Structures are given as structure tokens and as C-alpha cells.
Curated annotation (Swiss-Prot):
Protein name: 5'-deoxynucleotidase VC_1978
Ranges for domain HD: 30-142
Residue sites binding substrate per the record: R18, W19, H33, D69, D77, L78, P79, T80, D137
GO cellular component, one term: cytoplasm
Protein residues bound to a divalent metal cation: H33, H68, D69, D137
Catalytic activity: a 2'-deoxyribonucleoside 5'-phosphate + H2O = a 2'-deoxyribonucleoside + phosphate
Signal peptide limits: none
Lineage: Bacteria, Pseudomonadati, Pseudomonadota, Gammaproteobacteria, Vibrionales
HAMAP family assigned to the protein according to its UniProt record, in alphabetical order: 5DNU
Protein keywords: Cytoplasm, Hydrolase, Metal-binding, Nucleotide-binding
Matches recorded under PROSITE patterns: HD
Residues carrying the site annotation Appears to be important in orienting the phosphate for catalysis: R18
Family: Belongs to the 5DNU family.
Annotated Gene3D superfamilies: Hypothetical protein af1432
Amino acid sequence: MQESHFFAHLARMKLIQRWPLMRSISSENISEHSLQVAFVAHALAVIKNKKFGGTLNPERIALLAMYHDTSEVLTGDLPTPIKYFNPEIAKEYKKIEAAAERRLLDMLPEELRDDFRPFLISNTADPDESAIVKQADAICAYLKCLEELSAGNHEYAQAKKRLDVTLRERHSEEMAYFLQTFAPSFELTLDEIS
């Protein structure tokens, strides 16, 4: 049996900091972020199914969300303003991400690859499931902005404005429900939510 470094690489997710160009009151790594995205994606899928006639698999979507940023253990977290500075950079970075995803998949023993492929290779996921994960990813970035702004960190004001646009572009009924029901609490203190 051949040794695999796959999970040793995933364990390094905790070392990759998000928001690297921003002064943050509370730091966040991609391991923490992926767990929060999994929570939110799962909730969005449940909300869509219960309230808006969806037929999604919330557990599968939570797994997709857990793995959605794993390629960053090889690429690092490129800040959004750089990643999307122009279409050429965005296109080339997508190629880098795809190569990193394939490299991670290739680290697994051959007999496990088919089971992990849908979670590691982003272009193999079902478009409806991917859309929920993308929505959750944007919501989590938005919630981070709310937390930082409510703690007095105005460094996140511009990021929040950019995310307001992103959330409008990705709008869905389940997102609106989630944001109306859960987001306001992120601007409150511990005493206020207790």
C-alpha cells in the first residue's frame, strides 16, 4: 500500500489565512471558513427544500462546501481584488485552481479517487449544488464583514459594498430567507444574542 499525503495537505488548511490584505480584528483561516460555508450551504439547501420546493441533498452540499477551498493548500488564498482584477487574470487563475484540484485528487489512492472527484474537482459538481455553495461562500464573506464592521473595523466597509452587489447577483429565495432570518444576529454582541 502506497503512502498518501492528501490529508496532511488538508490539515494545512488551518495555516492559510483569509483576507490577507485586510486588517482584521479576528483572523480567519480556510479551515474555519470551509466549516462555516458547510453550515450555511447545508442550511440553504434545507431552506430551499422546505420553503421553496427544492429537491437538493443538503448533506452532499455540506460536503461540497467542506472541500470547496481545498485547492488553496497548494495555491494559497489569492485576494478577490487580485483574482478578478481583469478577465485574463481570472481565467488563468481558474487554470491554476484546476491544476491544484487535479494534483490533490492524484494524491489519493487510485481506489478512492472516484469517490472524492465530485468534491475536489469543481467542474464536475452538479450546477444547482455548486450554486448553493457559491451562495453560501458569498454569505459567509458578507457575515465576516458584518462582524468586523460591528466591532468598529471600517477596513471592511468597501468589501461589504462589493459583497452587497455579489449577493444581489446571486439572489435566490433561500438566500433572502437566510439573510433576513440569521444575518442580523452577526451585528449583535454576545450579551444581545444570549
